[in-house]
Amino acid sequence: MLPAVVLALGMITSLAPPWLAAETGMPAAPAARCEALAARLRVAPRLKPVVADMCRRAPTFRRQVVRLTQQAGLAITVEPGDFPIGGRARASTAIARVDGGLRSADVLVRPGDSLAVVELIGHEFEHILEQLDGVDLGAWVGHNGVHRVGGDDSAPIETERAQQVGRLVASEYAAAGAATTALRVR
């Protein structure tokens, strides 16, 4: 006779809608679906393993990828960038609009340890989502967690929303890694 845990797992997996994979052509498992969708992004070869790992370990990142890849005509590039060592910037996103719609978002992240890169990618993806949500950052500067990084009016804008989401993605990523490591030790 099978242990109750195995039976329970069998019941849980049987609850997944079998039509999902057939109708969309996408894997039904969230991590696999995220990886398939992330393949639509232009990710530098050295960052592809990190993005794939983020899909497996961070549910918030999976939601970001689903939403970003659903936006018709939006091209997203993720590459390592050169940022001054002593400078405050660790990442940036250049967004291009055509006829008011987002057409491209070029994300640059400072190379480093994987957890820092994970936080930066999640953070920058949230900036793209802010734009898709129609947030007028210029109008919000100085209010509700929106500020310029630097002294003048042309300085980049930072948001508390992107900072929090970047930290959330990194914490999910780290927690999943710790859980995986703990499972291997047992």
Segments the model singles out, each with a brief description of its role:
Residues 3-14:
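Bacterial N-terminal signal peptides
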Residues 155, 159, 163-186:
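Long, well-structured alpha-helical subdomains associated
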Residues 115, 131-161:
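Post-HEXXH active-site segment of zinc metalloproteases
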Residues 83-116:
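Active-site scaffold of zinc-dependent metalloenzymes
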Residues 15-55:
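N-terminal low-complexity, Pro/Thr/Ser-rich intrinsically disordered segments
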Residues 119-132:
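Active-site recognition of the HExxH zinc-binding catalytic motif
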Residues 51-73:
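Zn2+-dependent metallopeptidase catalytic core
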Residues 35-37, 41-49, 101-109, 142-149:
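Acidic/histidine-rich, surface-exposed loop or edge segments in extracytoplasmic proteins
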